[in-house]
Amino acid sequence: MKKSTLKPTCKYPLDLFDRYEFRSYGHAMEILADAFPEEWGEIENALKKFTITTAELRKAGGNETAIPKKFDAVLYPLKWEEIKITGDLHVKLYPRAGKKGTFSKEPFKEIPIKRWIDGHNIDFIKNRVAFDLEWNSKDQTFDRDLLAMRTYFDCGIIDVGIIVTRAEELNDIFKSLKLMGKYGASTTWMGKLVPRLDSRRNGGCPILAIGIRK
């Protein structure tokens, strides 16, 4: 999947690039800007409003602190919804009918596989855009997020996903505040997300990865 590290243009406001790192996989940014301008505009507005204080950085907790909830306050009133999906797989086996390559119109066996898709949830979905924030969870959370977005994409529910997390340069602030023990290398940040995207764990789903800069 093609990846690009984005640079500011007239389409993508300069003030966002001053505050965030952007990496686009599968032309995710172009899809958002051209096909979903309303949804992207709401995300853009949420990113512009987003701020963090040193007091919030010091507060105990991971992804349930006040920091991630700032996106809740902006997006949920705009009809972004948390959604979970499940799905059953119904497999039909058709016997050969006559010559090779022709098959009966009726299956001779049917195999139902319950909960083939089981409980994938995404924090924010609107129209065909998915959005998730991973501030300070275990880095394996990215595997869950990417599998969920890939599954929603394969099922025809979404066309593009967005994941926001910490950029590497925030480590300078964490070190100055003596917080590196809390925001360690095994938590969610761009250094853990990008290799997963480079190895295509998102499947065919276009993903815009956004890193919060200092």
Name each model feature, range by range.
Residues 63-67, 141, 185-192:
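Soluble or luminal CAZymes and related metallo-dependent hydrolases
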Residues 130-133:
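Glycine-rich active-site/cofactor-binding loop and its immediate structural neighborhood
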Residues 135, 139, 144-161, 178, ...:
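Catalytic core segments in nucleotide and nucleic-acid processing enzymes
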Residues 57-60, 69-127, 140-147:
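Active-site metal-binding core of divalent-cation-utilizing nuclease and nuclease-like domains
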Residues 167-214:
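Domain-level recognition of nuclease-like catalytic cores that cleave nucleotide substrates
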Residues 67, 71-79, 152-153, 190-200:
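Hydrophobic, Leu/Ile/Phe/Ala-enriched alpha-helical segments that form helix-helix packing faces
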Residues 1-88:
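Nuclease-adjacent, charged terminal/linker segments that flank catalytic cores
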Residues 58, 62, 116, 157-162, ...:
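Class I S-adenosyl-L-methionine-dependent methyltransferase catalytic core
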